[in-house]
């Protein structure tokens, strides 16, 4: 069994991680932390977990991780970078669901996240946990930088075109939509029911923190810099991401065949039949990314539609997928959930 700990278990990604791990046949949860809820039973705070877990939240200042093989950080940005080194030095593997280790250029990270990085020496070692790209590196990793929700959907949508050199990589466009759970569980005015319901809006158009992460990943697949216009939107739904991606083709290519071949052996990327329009509800509660490809009017513009659940493939599910790879388990162990419909 893999003995696991969770730092920060009261947010949406934390409880999603709990939901997945309590059902995982090869994992035993040893500890879960929360400053505010220390001493409270996990199933008292989250009634959905009644009968599934007997742990209480522990004070992170007093917790002992020595019995853990791996620790997940489901915390705000800036926490994992302060604690990861001590865990790694103790032989404990770390999977960070926040952004602390995603961007290799530390100065760039500090610019976007507005803080000094506490462990720049670990950034180079951290493996970016997108299995469809870095599976072999993930196998041997001690420290995983779990991808962001938008970056997962956007990169999986663009990667086949970028790798094939079939598009103008200087002028990519990602028009993305997310449910309100992507903003986290903290109380904020823009996610109140009266503000978010019956409403639809863009945000962070001048620049979003996920832009450098997406740009970094696609540049690696392109073997050169890429240009990306990234516009996120907040939609009146709880969970889900829909990315509509645009790229100008530079040569004739069979998009359907290209995508089917690229993802033929990927257990969690589903390339839909030609002409399909994926829906966010088709992946709700699952670790799947569903993709459809289009070429309107047989012109020179490729339109790629990519949908994920921001809390699963965009966060907790992908983190467990990475854990499975790190420990030599079948990749789908404990995360091949059928999406919830309706």
UniProtKB/Swiss-Prot annotation:
Localization per record: Cytoplasm
Which Pfam families does this one have?
A: Semialdhyde_dh, Semialdhyde_dhC_1
Q: Reaction catalysed by this chain?
A: N-acetyl-L-glutamate 5-semialdehyde + phosphate + NADP(+) = N-acetyl-L-glutamyl 5-phosphate + NADPH + H(+)
Question: What does the entry give for GO biological process?
Answer: L-arginine biosynthetic process
Quote the cellular component terms of the Gene Ontology held in the record.
cytoplasm
The record's listing under InterPro entries reads: AGPR_AS, AGPR_type-1, NAD(P)-bd_dom_sf, NAGSA_dehydrogenase, Semialdehyde_DH_NAD-bd
PANTHER family in alphabetical order: N-ACETYL-GAMMA-GLUTAMYL-PHOSPHATE REDUCTASE, CHLOROPLASTIC-RELATED, N-ACETYL-GAMMA-GLUTAMYL-PHOSPHATE REDUCTASE, CHLOROPLASTIC-RELATED-RELATED
In which family does this protein belong, per the annotation? Belongs to the NAGSA dehydrogenase family. Type 1 subfamily.
Q: What does this protein do?
A: Catalyzes the NADPH-dependent reduction of N-acetyl-5-glutamyl phosphate to yield N-acetyl-L-glutamate 5-semialdehyde.
For this entry, the protein name equals N-acetyl-gamma-glutamyl-phosphate reductase
Question: Lineage of the native species?
Answer: Bacteria, Pseudomonadati, Pseudomonadota, Betaproteobacteria, Nitrosomonadales
GN (gene name): argC
């Amino acid at each position: 069994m893999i003995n696991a700990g969770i730092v920060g278990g009261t947010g949406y990604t934390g409880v999603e991680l709990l939901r997945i791990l309590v059902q995982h046949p090869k994992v035993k949860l040893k500890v879960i932390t929360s400053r505010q809820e220390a001493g409270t039973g996990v199933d008292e705070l989250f009634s959905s977990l009644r009968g599934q877990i007997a742990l209480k939240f522990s004070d992170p200042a007093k917790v002992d991780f020595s019995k853990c093989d791996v620790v997940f950080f489901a915390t705000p940005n800036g926490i994992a970078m302060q604690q990861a080194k001590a865990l790694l030095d103790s032989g404990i593997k770390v999977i960070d669901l926040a952004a602390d280790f995603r961007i290799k250029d530390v100065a760039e990270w500090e610019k976007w996240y507005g803080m000094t990085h506490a462990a720049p020496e670990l950034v180079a070692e951290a493996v970016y946990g997108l299995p469809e790209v870095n599976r072999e590196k993930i196998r041997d990793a001690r420290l995983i930088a779990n991808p962001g929700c938008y970056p997962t959907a956007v990169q999986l949508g663009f990667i086949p075109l970028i790798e094939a050199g079939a598009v103008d990589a200087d002028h990519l466009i990602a028009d993305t939509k997310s449910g309100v759970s992507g903003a986290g569980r903290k109380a904020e005015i823009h996610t109140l029911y009266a503000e978010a319901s019956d409403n639809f809006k863009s945000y962070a158009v001048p620049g979003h923190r996920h832009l450098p992460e997406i740009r970094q990943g696609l540049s690696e697949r392109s073997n050169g810099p890429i240009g990306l216009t990234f516009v996120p939107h907040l939609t009146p739904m709880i969970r889900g991401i829909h990315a509509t991606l645009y790229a100008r083709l530079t040569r004739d290519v069979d998009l359907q065949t290209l995508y089917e071949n690229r993802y033929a052996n990927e257990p969690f990327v589903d390339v839909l039949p030609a002409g399909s329009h994926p829906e966010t509800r088709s992946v709700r509660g699952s670790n799947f990314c569903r993709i459809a490809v289009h070429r309107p009017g047989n012109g020179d513009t490729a339109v790629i539609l990519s949908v994920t659940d921001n809390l699963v493939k965009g966060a907790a599910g992908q983190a467990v997928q990475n854990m499975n790879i790190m420990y030599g388990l079948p990749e789908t162990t404990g995360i091949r959930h059928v999406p919830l419909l309706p």
